Amino acid sequence: MSHSVRYIRLLPIIVLGLVLASCSTPTELPHTPAETAAAAPPPPIVALSPEASVATMQLPSGYRLEPVLTEPDIAEPVMIAFDGNGRMYVAEMRTYMQDADATGEQAPFSRVSRHEDTDGDGVYDKHTVFADKLLLPRIMLPLDDRIIIGETNTDDLYIYRDSDGDGVADEKTLWFKGGPRGGNMEHQPNGLVWAMDNGIYSTYYDYRLRFGADGKAMKEEIPVNGGQWGLTQDDWGKVWFVNAGNETGPVHFQQHIIYGQFSAPDELIGQYKAVWPLSHVGDTQGGPGELRPDKTLNHFTATCGQDIFRGDRLPAELRGNLLFAEPVGRLIRRTLITVDDGVTHLANAYEDQKSEFLRATDPLFRPVNMITAPDGTLYIVDMYRGIIQQGNWTQKGSYLREQIEAHKLQREIGRGRIYRLRHENFERGPQPHMLDETPAEWVQHLSHPNGWWRDTAQRLLVLRRDLSVVPALEKLGARDSADPRPRLHALWTLEGLSALSDKLILRALKSTDAQVRMEGLRLADARVRAKSTAHTALVAAMRGELKDADPRVTIQAMLSVRRAGLPDAKKMIQATAAASNSVGVYAINEQLWDEANNEDPQLIRLLGVNGLKAYRSGRTLYGSVCFACHGTDGHGAPKPGADGRTIAPSLAGSPRMLGDERATIAIVLHGLQGAVDGVDYGAPMVPMNSYSDAELANVLTYIRNSFGNRAPAVAPETVAARRAADAGRTNYWTLAELTSQIPALGVPRALFKRRAEWKLAANMAARDNSPLEAMLDGDPKTGYFTQDVKPFPLEWLTVELPARSRIVGIDIDSRGEKSEAGKEIGWAPVYSVEISDDGKTWTMVDAKVVGEPHARFNLPAPVEARHLRIAITEKDSWQAWVIKELNLYGDEK
């Protein structure tokens, strides 16, 4: 994919208060080459003026940046939002990382400020503190003359209002009671977006909100989205998420998140994860492995602040593109989005040139957010500071701390800039005055070429609930046109007003425009799912769309009939996939029936009711935080550009996870540094002690019983006890230190390989002369089968090893045998495990091991023995014992 582009340097020439551009190459700030870094310390990095900083930035020809708001009017800006009159609200995290230890970060001294352009010249000349004394504000959503604000460490959302027009909020009302929020501030919700479907989305939440007819918050559970910092939607209402921790960038973008997390083959084109910065300051938490020899970042590590550009005052080539920031790389990525055969593909617009849309040599350029503005341009939020990572990643002894201190990055705080991206061929658009307009005028704005105007008009119409505009909306919602976007906004506005008819949905499903048919399906599945009436015609139309010629529509029909809860949905979807040659249709079908949330039916027996509740809560936390490094499958997220390497260790079969729970609790509370099982992953496992005891217990319970793992649930009280015992600890653990406290961690968890030398015995008669040795042949189709088990409870199996060995785990695979009713049989509900040195005198190790078709139990502590006895101690409805494969784990001698 080739895009010819000329680059310009932005120079500090002020004309009418604007920064204009001049053709040149970017100015290089002083930096220390990699080969001489050890010889002499680099010079301290110092702040530049906004104009001088802009001069270090590189953009494609014709584009330029102009500062619209800077220090001292703002400090530490992290996000912006505009109300219906174009007033800009800025969330300022004024206590964020004021030194390398995050001293005072949790003090409520942050704010949301409001800024107005009173004369329409594009310069913000009126500044007020709208809401003060906040704890690191991270959520803003303007409504009408009100705005929702959310702070750190809570999921509560408040509505603020300025009733007297002085620019300072004097009313504060709780709108949504979410309760306290644990976790590091980098792992908390952000980016409240009112999407086209009238759902209000944020990162991390496994639910969406919406305004009810009475103005109260309504909550609906949806899949975890995997987003981290920043949120945006495209012209069709799909919400886009970006994650920093998994070093991938955009995640779960194939379909709207309400239908699940989906991926597709080759969805990222070429070397999409590779980045091409100009800055040579290697301050990445991943260490030298994240850098090229010249100390430039080599791939994503801090992606955030995304926007689908939907404005009308920049070149058409930019519209519909996904842009997001990489503040560690001091750059902004421009992503081209294409859809082929039902699969969405992403590509770096400048991959052929090994370049980026915007990049700077100024090391303090820290873009963290961007947004399509009311004037049709793009606004970029630059936190402009030294340290960008939170304190958990900058602890003493870390590689990142060394870089911070070497470059004196901790000194540069308290600034911030907001830039407007302009192009030489376009003027700014007019300032809106929607809050002073009528609902009828808002309906007209649904046809505006700037997506910000359309979104704002829809939101105001739904909030006002003035039904006098319904006829105008129905007319717009029924009309086919070259641009389907106004029609879709009209349909969803009617939905938000509870005034949408089945007739209009059916008309949308018959549209010649594929995008309209897709939205018709979404409207239909929401209507049918509500089960307010039979909606027979809608159901029939949804079934019909499974045969649509456009694979995008076919996929949406598959998702919609499933979400609508049609009784024969699975049969219809699988038949559709079987008849289709579309890659996208095939990929979606495969994932629809293989979701991570499909729960093992044995968990209720293994964990009990309370343990299962903990497991489910932990699954949500894992899916929103832990997956980024450890992967959705628990085997470690692949590291970009490093074949076979992962960002973090595998959790599947991990001795820390499956052994003494004190070890894994210690790690999540205070982190882990250094090599793990002989592999150096570069970055440490950071402390998670800002999460509550219950949250940590839940996520550990989930991990210990997922990815092939089996271990008892972790109790919150156990986490609390370990937290209290290590209360004075401030540094990371190392495995050596943990092993000195818990020697069992030093016992290998290797698969025993001398099975051919094992001697087996059992006191049960074999069925069909099946040999005991069949459980050791590595063939899951063969095994040892007993006759009906009698008498009870004296059934046992013994194993004599070639030599005395240390045993940490046992694996009994009984899968594959089913009763006439289709129930899995051949396994015992409870076992006991005993050991002996002579095969005569036995010592109990675990008297109550819960069984299952594939029983994987880990002993409470490593044991050393030559003889092992596994006995059945409880009897259920099964009649015989089946062992297809038997394996032991530990240190075999």
Regions found by a protein language model. Give the residues of each.
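The canonical Cys-X-X-Cys-His
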Residues: 370, 381, 418, 618-633, ...
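Disordered, acidic Ser/Thr/Pro-rich linker "stalks" and the adjacent N-terminal cap
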Residues: 46, 51, 746-804, 815-827, ...
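Beta-propeller domains with acidic blade repeats across secreted/periplasmic ectodomains
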Residues: 25-441, 452, 460-462, 533, ...
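Electrostatic cytochrome c docking/interface patches
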Residues: 599-623, 635-640
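Structural detector for internal amphipathic alpha-helices that build alpha-solenoid repeat scaffolds
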Residues: 429-432, 452-465, 485-499, 504-510, ...
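Gly/Gly-Pro-rich "capping" loops immediately C-terminal to redox-active cysteine motifs
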Residues: 406, 634-693
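Short beta-strand-plus-loop segments that form exposed binding edges in beta-rich domains
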Residues: 871-878
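Flexible coil segments in periplasmic/lumen-exposed cytochrome c-class electron-transfer proteins
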Residues: 31-32, 41-44, 601-613, 679-756, ...
